[in-house]
Amino acid sequence: MRTIVVIPTYNEADNVEPIFQAIMALGLPDLSVLIVDDHSPDGTGEIVERLMRGHPNQIELLHRSGKEGLGKAYKAGFARALEMGAEVIVQMDADFSHSPKYIPQLLERLKEVDVVVGSRYVMGGKLDERWEFGRYLLSWWANAIYTRLILNMQTKDSTAGFKAWRRATLLGLDLERIHSNGYDFQVEMAYVAEKLGYRIQEIPIYFEDRRIGKSKMSIPIKIESALRVWDVLARHRGLTPKDRAQA
């Protein structure tokens, strides 16, 4: 079963090769990586091109013209992975906050459900101990209280960016109805999947702070994403399983 790991990048020159190597070291059959790069000025794309020459059929690069947002990057990556014939698509960050070691667990659980979420907020899940208490509290409140209450979601880690999707699930969601472009993209994808009746399971992960580079998730971005939850509710509150797109 062809599995493609979609990783969006912007200025991840120090991380992109190590994350690729870590994924390949898993030794999983029929697994490849698709990097979606937003024209990084630090040479991330050039590093991927070099890796492509040395590892044909194991890594691909989707160049985008500029930094247009996380949502658009993922939608472009998902569409390309589907075109490439992926039966399973894993999404994750490039900075090792999502450890590749969890990929086999995601894939194993996906045999029984439609979406698997690498979750910080189920039993056994954990956040990096280096997080300040205020940062932890904000993240917990946004996921466990604010977003779940507004959207009446069952998924505990609604902003999780580490997921495994079945091909049929992504096709049934219809990516064209997903409009969020920032970090609220993760919330909208999870909410629509729930409303359409897809089976979602969360597995615990340890979320490590990025090893190298600066986080792109600022306080203003978090506040904006929280406010956009109301837009997600307005757009999709009436969805039912009958609204699944025909694959």
Q: Predicted segments — roles?
A:
Residues M153-Q154, R177-N181, A190-F207:
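Catalytic donor-sugar/metal-binding loop of nucleotide-sugar-dependent glycosyltransferases
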Residues R2-I4, S32, E188:
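Cell-envelope/extracellular polymer assembly enzymes that use nucleotide-activated donors
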Residues R64-E83, P100-Y183, R210-E224, D243:
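Acceptor/aglycone-binding surface of glycosyltransferases and processive sugar-polymer synthases
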Residues A86-S97:
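Short beta-strand-to-loop acidic/aromatic patch adjacent to the donor-nucleotide binding site
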Residues D30-S40, L62-H63, M92:
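Short beta-strand/loop segment that forms part of the nucleotide-sugar
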Residues D14-P18, D42-L51:
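Acidic helix N-cap motif at the loop->helix transition within catalytic regions
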Residues Q21-D30:
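Short, acidic, metal-binding catalytic loop of nucleotide-sugar glycosyltransferases
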Residues D37-E46, F96:
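A conserved acidic beta->alpha catalytic loop
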